[in-house]
Amino acid sequence: MSNISKETVEKVANLAKLEVSETEATAFAGQLGKIIELVEQLNTLDTNNVEPTSHAIDVSNVLREDVATKGLDRKEVLKNAPDQQDGMFKVPTIMEQ
């Protein structure tokens, strides 16, 4: 049986930059524990005679052929830019050198 503690949930939430309340952390700990128990049940299955596969169903490419097309010209692209300089988008600096 897998035991996920409230502290583990809080640590993972912190690493993922998520805010969770005490109540949510307690609830998530129980829910995650149940999920892990269900996944652990898969380890009991005998898969010796099961052929490895990457997809459960046959997959075929349904995408169109990649064809290069003429793009927008620079003036058309920049006409709605809030700020531009030398024919390029000008954006605020976010990193110092």
Curated annotation (Swiss-Prot):
<comment type="function">
    <text>Allows the formation of correctly charged Asn-tRNA(Asn) or Gln-tRNA(Gln) through the transamidation of misacylated Asp-tRNA(Asn) or Glu-tRNA(Gln) in organisms which lack either or both of asparaginyl-tRNA or glutaminyl-tRNA synthetases. The reaction takes place in the presence of glutamine and ATP through an activated phospho-Asp-tRNA(Asn) or phospho-Glu-tRNA(Gln).</text>
</comment>
<dbReference type="GO" id="GO:0006450">
    <property type="term" value="P:regulation of translational fidelity"/>
</dbReference>
<keyword id="KW-0067">ATP-binding</keyword>
<dbReference type="InterPro" id="IPR036113">
    <property type="entry name" value="Asp/Glu-ADT_sf_sub_c"/>
</dbReference>
<keyword id="KW-0648">Protein biosynthesis</keyword>
<dbReference type="InterPro" id="IPR003837">
    <property type="entry name" value="GatC"/>
</dbReference>
<keyword id="KW-0436">Ligase</keyword>
<dbReference type="GO" id="GO:0006412">
    <property type="term" value="P:translation"/>
</dbReference>
<keyword id="KW-0547">Nucleotide-binding</keyword>
<protein>
    <recommendedName>
        <fullName>Aspartyl/glutamyl-tRNA(Asn/Gln) amidotransferase subunit C</fullName>
        <ecNumber>6.3.5.-</ecNumber>
    </recommendedName>
</protein>
<dbReference type="GO" id="GO:0050566">
    <property type="term" value="F:asparaginyl-tRNA synthase (glutamine-hydrolyzing) activity"/>
</dbReference>
<dbReference type="GO" id="GO:0070681">
    <property type="term" value="P:glutaminyl-tRNAGln biosynthesis via transamidation"/>
</dbReference>
<comment type="similarity">
    <text>Belongs to the GatC family.</text>
</comment>
<dbReference type="GO" id="GO:0005524">
    <property type="term" value="F:ATP binding"/>
</dbReference>
<dbReference type="GO" id="GO:0050567">
    <property type="term" value="F:glutaminyl-tRNA synthase (glutamine-hydrolyzing) activity"/>
</dbReference>
<dbReference type="Pfam" id="PF02686">
    <property type="entry name" value="GatC"/>
</dbReference>
<comment type="subunit">
    <text>Heterotrimer of A, B and C subunits.</text>
</comment>
